[in-house]
Design a protein with these regions (language model features):
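Conserved acidic catalytic loop of the alpha/beta-hydrolase fold
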Residues: 204-218
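Glycine-rich nucleophile elbow surrounding the catalytic serine of serine-hydrolase chemistry
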Residues: 133, 223-235
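A catalytic-pocket lid/entrance helix-loop region that shapes and gates access to the active site
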Residues: 175, 233-297, 329-332, 338, ...
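Conserved alpha/beta-hydrolase "acid-adjacent" motif
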Residues: 479-484
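Short beta-strand/loop motif that positions the catalytic acidic residue
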Residues: 466, 472-474
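Alpha/beta-hydrolase fold active-site neighborhood
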Residues: 296-465, 528, 547-630, 634-644, ...
């Protein structure tokens, strides 16, 4: 789905609400790409990327339609594979109105297989959005599934209205230059009678037209997030051409019913917070009842919203207004690192921030509010992600609780009435009022759209799902397309196998090498294989136990029995604060541009070398009010962590610390080994890495 926070960075790597942050986010939309994390992500991918797979130039297919318009491929494509072939296929814009002869050109890229002989199939990929360009995800597709190029061609197609297939560009909507309702209405007016013709039903027919024009008899189809709708629409129309299907965190026809997806996702937030905390030793030690504490925070914000200034992860001050609806939005679309997809920033800190709020300290929670990408924001280049296409597809695919012929005022009344009739716990732990927030209500996001004629639906009545090998996967911490929705989608496909992945968020393939191997092998063998590896988190994301206002509020670091430690409890608490300060800056560097401010004061700057090693320098950073941390840390491409820090402040006698360990590394959670001197006494302590 348009995971509205991992889409445009995923275009840089793999990737918006369903599939948003294209630095490493499939199935999320709309966060501007950021150089620092793109460097790290690119470095990570380069170890797998089958760049220059073919020494020769473009290799044209032998059985293709004369209707194809072949063009020179973009440098981004030829840099990955010189043999790539690119073109356009003109297709009818208005299939349901044969008297209208307008055509829309559908852009595609073909990456040919390596072995001799004909391709066994073409592999299709679609990460949905909607609004995302598929071809902009070429690098991550090749990085993740490159081994399948042995006997399979890769066929990447930009859906109509996206990427190079005449991307919809509604400036006010794309760049948030006017209020959303006005911008959406203007976009609908701009498209006019074409409003109804960007639905997934038409996209399925475009896709099969490209398949037929290129001469492929069989295709394997990977659909992630809202791409599940693309696969569904194709499968019920052209199932005879499918060899296999992989659905990763898929949307499907169940989620198109009014409020169903909204409710599933809202209810999944408590599970996401609970699992993230319980798996992290640092958080679990302080929060024995995460469900109760999360409910307590929601009730507190419902009764008394929080407002104040805070900094984004890139150090930009913003005025934050955090009410219950905004808290649901923050929880449903967690701030996630694009360079380390196995990592939840916002939801990993939300319990600790809630505890601080109870004690009168709103700083941690306000910062979380500042760091989330708002639904109404500048989405940048529409050829990477089109907000106009997002609404053009979403609004004709979904079943809305109003009549399209009704005026806006009547639609608003019908929507409000439908929400009021939902059970009071439909969005639990959140209220129905929170569930009507623009950022999380897929119904409200379409209020100001128009549908002048009936569209080509995802499925017509009584659809027949094909009996082909189908693998369906869901992360147990996904709140963009919750597991409850994914299970319903899986049940529609007769030969499906459902697999849940521990500690995975939205679109599991970017969270675990285990999943990459399972999916790639499935396409090769049509067998699911041993899924044991999905039951244990590959990497445990670091969740925060507490935000100490002063060092005395922190947990004391554990004594390293073999290190000759000489410092007492007070200084061991200072060490915990110092490590938290450094890790806090590192976290923010992965979700921002690398440069930002400390929790309470100070700054940090980051850079990444050619080998993917990140250096972050801290200047007067303050995490607890009575401890100041200076120094630098190096986070290696191998996930190693080394820091040299100078500590000062009223809570400590001061000194220097050397820290070694790993951060966000696969495997069980380890401990940072800390040495040095504080107040002239030897330091030898241990602090959990997560």
């Amino acid at each position: 789905m348009k995971d509205k926070f991992r889409a445009i960075t995923l275009a840089v790597i793999l990737c918006c609400p369903f599939g948003l942050d294209p630095a490493w986010s499939w199935g999320q939309t709309g966060r501007p790409s950021q150089i620092l994390r793109s460097q790290r992500t690119s470095q990570r991918l380069s170890t797998q990327n089958p760049a220059s797979l073919h020494a020769q130039g473009p290799r044209m297919l032998t059985t293709t339609s004369l209707e194809i318009l072949w063009v020179q491929c973009p440098a981004e494509a030829t840099g990955l594979d010189p043999a790539v072939a690119c073109g356009y296929l003109p297709v009818p814009m208005h299939r349901e109105q044969p008297e209208r002869t307008e055509k829309i050109r559908i852009y595609f890229e073909v990456y040919p297989h390596i072995n001799q002989g004909p391709a066994e199939s073409a592999m299709l990929f679609n990460d949905g959005g909607p609004g995302l360009s598929t071809t902009s995800l070429r690098a991550p597709v090749l990085a993740l599934f490159g081994q399948n190029l042995d006997v399979h061609d890769f066929l990447l197609i930009d859906d109509r209205g996206r990427g190079r297939s005449s991307a919809i560009n509604c400036p006010d909507l794309q760049h948030a230059t006017t209020p959303f309702k006005k911008a959406e209405a203007a976009c609908a007016a701009q498209l006019g009678s074409s409003d109804s013709w960007y639905g997934t039903g038409d996209i399925a027919m475009d896709t099969d037209a490209v398949r037929a024009a290129l001469g492929y008899e069989k295709v394997d189809y990977w659909g992630g997030s809202y791409g599940g709708e693309d696969v569904t629409a194709y499968a019920i129309r052209f199932g005879e051409h499918l060899r296999s299907i992989i659905l990763d965190a898929p949307m499907g026809t169940p989620g198109l019913r009014p409020f169903l997806l909204d409710g599933d996702n809202a209810r999944a937030t408590a599970r996401e917070v609970r699992l993230g905390c319980k798996r992290s030793p640092t958080c679990a030690a302080d929060h024995s009842e995460p469900d109760f504490e999360f409910a307590q925070l929601i009730q507190s914000i419902r009764s008394k919203p929080v407002q104040g200034w805070a900094y984004t992860a890139s150090g930009i001050p913003v005025d934050v207004k955090l009410n219950e609806g905004a808290l649901l939005y923050l929880s449903s679309f967690p701030t996630t690192s694009s360079s380390v997809p196995t990592f939840f920033v916002s939801t990993g800190e939300i319990l600790a921030a809630g505890e601080s709020l109870l004690h009168g300290d709103s700083v941690p929670l306000l910062r979380l509010g500042a760091e989330v990408t708002p639904f109404v924001t500048d989405y940048g280049d529409p050829t990477a992600y089109s907000q106009g296409d997002y609404v053009a597809t979403l609004c004709v695919d979904f079943h809305e609780p109003w009549e399209w012929s009704d005026p806006i005022t009547k639609r608003q009344e019908q929507l409000a009435s439908a929400i009021s009739e939902l059970p009071s716990d439909f969005f639990a732990l959140f209220s129905r009022t929170a569930g009507a927030n623009l950022g999380v209500s897929f119904e409200k996001q379409c209020l100001w759209w128009q549908k002048p004629t009936p569209s080509n639906p995802v499925t017509r009545s009584n659809p027949r799902y094909p009996s082909v090998p189908t693998l369906v996967m869901s992360g147990d911490m996904d709140t963009l397309v919750a597991t409850e929705e994914v299970r319903q989608v899986a049940a529609l496909f007769p030969e499906s196998t459902f697999v849940k992945v521990a500690e995975a968020g939205h679109v599991t393939v970017v969270w675990s090498q285990c999943v990459v191997n399972l999916q790639s092998n499935f396409f090769e063998t049509l067998q699911v294989g041993d899924t044991t590896c999905t039951k244990t988190p590959e990497t445990v994301s670091a969740a925060i136990g507490r935000f100490p206002f002063v060092a005395a509020d922190a947990r004391a670091a554990e004594i390293d029995s073999g290190g000759g430690n000489e410092i007492g409890i007070a200084e061991r608490k200072v060490v915990t604060v110092a490590i938290a300060t450094a890790v806090d800056a590192l976290k923010r560097s992965t979700i921002g541009n690398g440069n930002g401010v400390g929790l309470r004061s100070g700054t940090f700057q980051s850079s990444v070398d050619m080998n993917g090693n990140q250096t972050t320098t801290l200047t007067n950073c303050v995490f607890a009010t009575d401890v100041t941390t200076n120094g630098s840390l190096v986070w290696g491409a191998d996930r190693s962590f080394v820091a040299d820090l100078t500590i000062s402040g009223s809570a400590t006698s001061g000194g220097n610390l050397h820290v070694e360990g790993s951060w966000e590394a696969p495997g069980s959670v380890g401990k940072f080994k800390v040495s040095g001197m504080l107040g002239g006494r030897r330091v030898a302590v241990l602090v959990p890495e997560a």
